Amino acid sequence: LLILIFFSLASWAVIIWKFIELKRAKNACDEFLTAFWQAKRLDQLYEEAASVEGNPVVEVFAAGYREAEHVLQVRSKNTSVESSVLSAELSGVESVERALRRAANHEISNLERLITFLATTASATPFIGLFGTVWGIMNSFRNIGSQGAAGLAVVAPGISEALIATALGLAAAIPAVIAYNHFQNQIKVLSDDIENFTADFLNLVGRHFMSM
């Protein structure tokens, strides 16, 4: 029973924490995307975003912007080197794309943190409760055998323990599986926002490189 109580309390703590975290992340992402498309200078937006924490799209933007700045600095130092212009442009865009993908994967992994605990709770606690149920019934039969009678006073404690274990298992599993599916959907929405932003930012970088 203590194991089921632990899983129940821990899963509720995770549910509350992830609900707040994902809600804040979604609101922050929407605000930044609006600011991004309204911004006239990306360097100013980058400076403003440097102090922002807990926003996955900002982290992806910052990683891509830093890599783009690095590519431009390298190109400015190597202006005397003869090379294929198209090859240089593609190399720069690919470097920015790799930086964006790394940052996006890292942020998505952060969003998925502790979600697997809810899946574990949802799948394991019914079986733990079932084990408690079987154990309680076994105790009831043991009491019947030891006392040679099958009265209510003999079987009631074991049956009660069995039903409590079943109820605790379901009480832990049901909220966990509902929350898991809900959070997976929210993470999918945020992942789509990150992927769309990555593609849009990469297009902007590509056009900027080609215009130079």
Where are these regions (language model features)?
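Predominantly long cytosolic amphipathic alpha-helical stalk/bundle segments
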Residues: 26-125, 139-151, 178-212
